[in-house]
Regions:
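N-terminal cap/recognition module
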Residues: 47-50, 64
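Active-site SXXK
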Residues: 55-66
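Residues that act as N-cap/strand-start positions at coil-to-secondary-structure junctions
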Residues: 12-13, 81, 234
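Short acidic/glycine-enriched loop/turn segments that link adjacent beta-strands
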Residues: 13, 36, 94-95, 246, ...
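His/Glu-based metal-binding/catalytic segments typifying zinc-dependent metallopeptidases
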Residues: 25-46, 53-54, 222-280
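Charge-rich, well-structured scaffold segments of protease-associated domains
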Residues: 1-2, 20, 31, 75-223, ...
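N- or domain-start disorder-to-order transition segments that initiate the globular core
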Residues: 1-37
Length: 424
């Protein structure tokens, strides 16, 4: 039976109100009175692609709350806990996301702590050494796992091992990370030119003035920070041997384009058909028919300057080659045969429903707003993307697969006990 269609008219997303502060920062507001909570998100272009020393970007972001001019790390944590406030840091290749969430009635005390964290960090030497030692140990343990290693070598195969999106650093580089490295990155990147602020939840004029006053204190730089981005240098196949591994970790994919490309949404549909939900083609094949894996996934991944399609699975070592062959077979089947309308209708509804789930609540809307702002668009693109999803045809899915998923363009990375290259 054909799935009932979920229409774009069911998704209405408010546009953020922009205020430009005297120091040039864009302050975006998404007011909602549904809940007595609010969140402030500061987004800095200060991700790992911008760092001059290995691990400096993540260390700087995570050390912001480890002591300030007027408060110790413990005092910061206790003050936030006392008011039920929440502080979160996320770091990716391009950006650092720093968020403060609180009940509306405790906004004032939370903002005071936010000012200490954002404007007065000390990066204490003893806290830094403890942080580096802990992260070094964690990374050493993680790199014993085939899934961690394949993620790193797949990035290297896509972009090249010197590219900001492909480079990995040895654990020992934590030993040479210094307080001066963090202070230098902080001064260079945590500036007004490098920042935008998004507020969501129950926000009145008083709260908005307080947020604006804090953001206005961020220093200005001579110019916006830039990074060296060489052209990616892809490698078709990478293998790392782990003789004792009982499972192999696999990645298959290719470089494509960023979210602003006209075919990005269509390729999101292609990725979902292949491995974006439990009943996807790769799940039915590798898990359902063959029992090679408990799970396999596919997705389009977007960075600021590049994007790619990736397929990921972990399979038994003895079925590494057969599993890869089935991945290639499913890609080829999508290229060769138009998919059934009923299957595509299900995929459309799953994708539209996921958008609606993400947008359920002020903070989810704020997250999507941030993503759109960083891509140079606004929230109007959400409805447009849903229209694209709902209007795509089996012929269009096949056209995209034919155009972008040629076998000779695919990049494969494997970590495991046996190299399957000559069997695939």
């Amino acid at each position: 039976m054909t799935q009932p269609r979920i229409t774009p008219s069911q998704v209405e997303v408010a546009e953020a109100r922009r205020t430009t502060l005297p120091n040039g920062i864009g302050l975006y507001t998404l007011a909602s009175d549904d809940f007595e909570v609010l969140r402030i998100s500061f987004v800095f272009r200060a991700g790992s692609s911008m760092q001059h020393a290995p691990f400096a970007a993540s260390a700087t972001a995570n050390m912001l709350s480890e002591g300030s001019r007027d408060m110790t790390a413990r005092q910061i944590a206790e003050r936030l806990d006392f008011h039920g406030s929440y502080f979160e840091v996320n770091v990716d290749r391009d950006y650092v996301y720093i968020s403060f969430s609180s009940l509306s009635k405790f906004f004032g005390p939370t903002l005071e702590v936010a000012e200490q964290i954002l404007l007065q960090p000390l990066f204490p030497e003893d806290e830094l050494r403890a942080y580096c030692e802990k992260r070094k140990q964690t990374l050493t343990i993680e790199r014993r796992k085939v899934d961690t290693v394949v993620r790193e070598i797949f990035a290297e195969a896509l972009f090249g091992d010197k590219h900001p999106y492909g480079i990995s650093y040895p654990e020992k580089d934590y030993d040479t990370l210094t307080r001066a490295d963090l202070e230098s990155l902080y001064r260079r990147l945590y500036t007004a030119e490098n920042c935008l602020v998004v507020c969501s939840g129950r926000i009145g004029e008083e709260e908005l003035q307080g947020i604006g006053a804090l953001a206005e204190k961020l220093p200005r730089a001579d110019r916006s920070a830039t990074a060296d981005f060489p052209a990616p240098r892809s490698e078709a196949y990478r293998f790392v041997e782990r003789p004792d591994a009982v499972q192999s970790s696999l990645r298959v994919g290719r470089l494509l384009f960023t979210r602003t490309h006209p075919d990005f949404v269509g390729m999101q549909v292609v990725a979902t058909v292949l491995g974006g939900y439990f009943g996807s083609r790769l799940m039915q094949n590798l898990r359902g028919e063959h029992g090679y894996t408990y799970g396999v996934g596919a997705a389009m991944v977007n960075f600021e300057r590049e994007g790619y399609l990736g397929i990921a699975a972990q399979v038994g070592a003895e079925v590494t080659a057969p599993a890869l062959r089935e991945i290639y077979n499913e890609i080829e089947r999508l290229r060769r045969e138009p998919m059934p309308e009923e299957e595509l209708s299900l995929v459309k509804n799953i994708m539209t429903g996921e958008v609606m789930r993400i947008l359920d609540g002020p903070f989810g809307i704020a997250d999507v707003t941030i993503e759109n702002l960083l891509c140079g668009t606004n929230n109007g693109v959400i409805e447009e993307n849903i229209r694209r999803i709902q209007s795509i045809t089996p012929a269009e899915v096949q056209r995209l697969a034919v155009k972008y998923l040629r076998r000779e363009d695919l990049i494969t990375a494997v970590v495991g006990a046996v190299d399957p290259k000559h069997e695939i």
